[in-house]
Amino acid sequence: SGGGKTHLALELLKYLCGFVDRAAYDTLEQGLSLSFQNAWKNAAMQEVGSRVIVLAKEPIKELRERLRKRKSPNVIVIDSITALVGFTRTVFMELINEFPDKLFIFIAHEENNKPYPAIAQHVRKLSEVKIRVEGYKGFVTTRFKGEKGEGGADFVIWEQGANEYWIDKL
């Protein structure tokens, strides 16, 4: 909590809006709280206009109904798995199998350097790209080949926060 996950997800979503017509951010954990509104402003999400819809704590059942409609979002951020009640391996597999042409970005917390809750570990194992966030840095792991220019590089989410966090850890 407080390491930059939401900000990173918003920045990534803003970037992906350059390639898709519609995207959705399901803010299950924070809802439309002041902290989420501040993260939205800090990521300058107004730049994407109406291409991103914010879903305030929309459960998976309703999200699936939304995604079945014409002109539904192409990219969906779920923030976070921790706040998803009843999200099981079966529900996850049904979701990604029903919508194979959608890009899902799942956010999870960590306990002992592992995704939490347990379903988050399963989601991570099946993901093409994983970004572990710690101390305002994103550490990328991917199934793509970095030497072919397909992978991704680690990056700083917030320079001042990262500098303060990592100064004693290096």
Write out the residue ranges for each language-model feature.
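Conserved catalytic network of the ASCE P-loop NTPase/AAA+ motor domain
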Residues: 15-19, 47, 68-71, 96-100, ...
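Phosphate-binding/switch loop-helix module in NTP-utilizing enzymes
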Residues: 54-107
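Active-site-adjacent loop/helix micro-motif of nuclease/hydrolase catalytic cores
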Residues: 4-8, 85-90, 115-116
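Conserved P-loop
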Residues: 1-61
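Phosphate-binding/switch region of NTP-binding enzymes
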Residues: 97-170
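Alpha-helical scaffold elements adjacent to nucleotide-binding pockets in ATP/GTP-utilizing enzyme cores
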Residues: 35-39, 91-94, 122-126
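Short, ordered loop/turn segments at secondary-structure junctions
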Residues: 28-30, 81-82, 109-110
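Short, well-ordered secondary-structure micro-motifs
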Residues: 36-39, 64-67, 88-89, 116-118
